[in-house]
Amino acid sequence: STSAGATGSAGKDEYNDYGRGASAGNSGALERGDDEMRAYNRHWYKTAVENLVLRTRSIGFIEGGELGRDFRRRYGIKPAQAAGLGIFPSHHQKMILTDYALPDRATGFVMGHNLLRNYWDTDDHPFESTLRDGFKPWHDLSTRVYGPILNDLKRSFEDAWEKAEPSGQPVPKLLASEVFARPALRRGKGEMAQICRTLGLEERSIRDIYHLTLANARVYVYFENQYFRYKPLAMHLRAIRRALKGAGWPRDFYVFVVTNVPDGHGRVNTYEMLQALGKSTAMPHFHKKNGKGDDDKLVKADLDGVHIHVCSLATSGNTEQGMEYRPIYVHSKLMLIDDVFFTVGSANVNVRSMEVDTELNIACTSPTLTKEWREKLWKLHTGRMPSGNMADEFDAWDEIIKNNAKRMVNKQHLAAPLIEFFDDSSTGLRAD
């Protein structure tokens, strides 16, 4: 099940243009007015795969209008902005469930990746690669799951399937959760996990799991996300630190962020997020334009003892013009807390993912897996094996980004992909 505007699509700069008419789900053949190609496409898709059923759906205007009114009530935003959120939501979940009827083979994927070939890259994210089909160096995360959680994935899919087209067409019978447990345990030690979702006004459990786990964080939080522009989350983090400080909690707290420098869309929201975390100087033109706000003193008080790094990723390479640098595009949607908890999936740190679009994440309390995520990712980004001491890690990140800044000035190869987030653009739009 997918959104109507995304069926078989790939963007205009991508390999496949069958769905370039995103607003209406048109194919490239239709856009070019090629009736012969249209007929061929229809015949090919009809006969290429037997027993293939595709359903598309969009979020209706009534539900969209309710979403818009909800935003106006809670955030006091302008009618046009509220209408945009309500009228143009998307189905953003990325999930695969295979061989469900065969418990010994059943497998689920809860993903950040889109199902397009040009979202592929290696962990090295080279400056140039003949294997990478399109785009730029690309960093993304997904999970493979087994066991009783497959029933939750199936229920979630069935819900979307029936909403798309309640035709009464049969779907595989829901099996008892227990039948998936034994095959999964043969693969190794299991961990407790659950799915969480965003379904418009119906469910916002991804937002809830972010709020709940941040409230319990005591040592560090790591965000690795395509977007970092959901100000309510920053304000929630500040409220938690303020409450802990008032209760006499003595320890420092560390926030590590890896995200992208925004394009024109979303720059205003990103600035507001960074401003709420006392990092607005990373966007100097916006910082100068907005000056010191009424919240500045509160930011310092709330975040006393909170140490924050906001970073991006890049790679370097020699070209005919000399040394050049390219961003590694971060498409991940991951949060780690205290080497105890992680959530990963399709949800970005923005309003759309937390409150509007349909999203699917997995949430897991597992010291083993959370530490494994952190060690592998931080080694990729910093070029060194991280320790478990967050004060030492914070200093190590600081040293790496300063070293890379000097290397970029001197036109040298980067020592590691991690660089400081910096956006010197003077213009930008609000996008949620």
Feature locations, PLM:
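Structural motif corresponding to the C-terminal cap of alpha-helices
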Residues: 199, 225, 241-245, 318
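Intrinsically disordered or highly flexible coil/loop and linker segments, enriched in small
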Residues: 119, 162-173, 219, 223, ...
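Glycine-rich phosphate/diphosphate-binding loops that line cofactor/substrate pockets in enzymes
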Residues: 101, 207-222, 240-250
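Conserved catalytic-core segments centered on acid/base and nucleophilic motifs
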Residues: 96-98, 213-230, 332-337, 341-346
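Classical protein tyrosine phosphatase
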Residues: 1-10, 228-255, 271-274, 353-355
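Long, C-terminal catalytic modules of enzymes
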Residues: 108, 113, 207, 231, ...
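HKD-type phospholipase D/PLD-like phosphodiesterase module
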Residues: 1-216, 258-333, 352-354
